[in-house]
Each structure stands twice: as C-alpha cells, then as structure tokens.
C-alpha cells in the first residue's frame, strides 16, 4: 500500500525520534521469515525493551541522517528491519543473536553502537556486553571487596588474641 506524503513524513518523524533517543541500532534482513517467526522476534524485542520497525529504505535513510544512528546507512538495502534500543547498548544484538539460534533466515547486516558502525561478525561480542544493572553490580562488587577485606583483617586481630588467651587458660587448667 502506497503511503501519501503526510504519512511518509509521519514515519520519517517517528523513526528520526527513535534514532535520536536510541543508544544502539541494529539492521537485519528478514527475507524468508514467516509471520509466526516475525511475531516471535517482535515479542522477544518487546521483552528486551527494543523497538523494531520495518520501514522503506528511502524513508529510513531520510530519518537516520544527522543522528548517531547514521552510521548504518550503507547497509540499508533490501528488506530490512531496524531495531532500536534506548537504554542498553547490547539489547538489539542480544535479541538478534537469540533469534538467530533458532531461525537462520534472519541475517544481521550491521549494528550501530553509540554512533559507531559495528560489522555483523561482531554481533556476539556486542551481545555479550553486560546490561547496565550487571555492570553496576560488577563495579559495586569491585569497590566493596577492599572494604570487606579490611573489615575481616581488623576483626581477625582480636580473634587471634582471644584464641591465644583461651589456649593459655586451657594449658594452665591442665
């Protein structure tokens, strides 16, 4: 169905807004996917807070110009689906990677992470990045480790003295 000019402008505005607020974008060719597979991809994307859009390439190119997602413009050809993540850098890559495990028909053409183009062969590396919450917990554990070690060391000195005194008392009783 052909879109009229107003509808095209609305699509460009929506995709442009998504591109401006997103931290990562993924481009994948969906040729050969069934409706059921596409529905599964969309539901897994929703679970991961990823927005998927199928847009005509000419409209997508207009929408992505002058945004940090502009780096994926060279791979916009053929029937592609765009995935946008607004918070997690690796979310789009994780959605595509998990979907490809069961459906080989989805072909990732490239990713844009913080304005940098990432080749599709680096999908696994980007997908394995920790989420924001995981990264915070790792940093907190690293920051907490020296404090815990200091606390254990400070507690151990009086405990050693107590054990020595107990041993001396036991020795004198015998």
UniProtKB/Swiss-Prot annotation:
Pfam families: Ribosomal_L10. The keyword rRNA-binding applies. One of its GO terms (biological process) is translation. CDD domains: Ribosomal_L10 (cd05797). GO terms for molecular function: large ribosomal subunit rRNA binding. The keyword Hydrolase does not apply. Keywords: Ribonucleoprotein, Ribosomal protein, RNA-binding, rRNA-binding. One of its GO terms (cellular component) is ribosome. PANTHER family: 39S RIBOSOMAL PROTEIN L10, MITOCHONDRIAL. Part of the ribosomal stalk of the 50S ribosomal subunit. The N-terminus interacts with L11 and the large rRNA to form the base of the stalk. The C-terminus forms an elongated spine to which L12 dimers bind in a sequential fashion forming a multimeric L10(L12)X complex. Forms part of the ribosomal stalk, playing a central role in the interaction of the ribosome with GTP-bound translation factors. Belongs to the universal ribosomal protein uL10 family. This is Large ribosomal subunit protein uL10. It comes from Vesicomyosocius okutanii subsp. Calyptogena okutanii (strain HA).
